[in-house]
Amino acid sequence: YFSKVENFERMSFHSNYEDLNWDIVEVVFICVQTPNNTKTNSVDTKFLESAISKIAELNNKDIIITVKSTIPPYEIENVCNNIGFDQNLITFNPEFLREGSAVYDFFNPDRIVLGGLNTDKTDKLKSLYKDFDAEIIITDPISSQLIKYLSNTYLPMRLSFVNEATRLSKYSGANLQDVLKGVGFDNRIGSHYFRPSPSWGGSCFPKDLVEVNNFYKDGDLNLPLISNIIKSNNEHLNWTVQQMLMLKNDNNLNKIYLVGAAFKEDTDDLRNSPTL
């Protein structure tokens, strides 16, 4: 992609904040990782906190600090309190890029979500996307983050449904491909994200689902569908392994080759890959 860039004077890469010319900076997009903390089983915001803290040291309230990283609703309050920064100066622009097609997805978004309490900052942020042919949703910070989390909840739920349909088709002796094709032709359902797999994985769906379960369980709220998506995925992976073992034993096989170690096609990402 970078070979197509005509004017590299508009693009530069740096490994530390000091090398940047902050005098000309109007908007900062923070895209740091927010991994799952295995000790607390909750999102780790230390990278986000460090990034905001570095920018806050400039003491320039005109800079629009925009968080693209995925963090739970209300968590930005804790982050800003830890570093003594006004959370109302933060805007949000959650990303919905897919691994393997990130550049295409950036230029062809289904929607653009902007969250913030300062209308001047969100309006300026909106102007950056004036040439994009996509619906722009401007909302509050909490809603913008929940949009991202619920998107990353629905998609694995849909994948889990297909995988359960796979087991049901196998049990009943039905033709799985015909079943999914027949169901997917319903316009209310569609055929996108509707293929069976050993199970789903990756660096986003698992951790985001864990966090969704964390923040709704803090209150008196029961969400039986959402709370069982991970369980369904784990059970399908176990079922897949059992099917492979049966295939091995029934045919006296000594070796089984697995093609594709990444968690999805068109990527080399091995994080939380069900194959491994």
Q: Which stretches of residues belong to each language-model region?
A:
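Structural/interface elements that position substrates and couple domains in central-metabolism enzymes
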Residues: 1-276
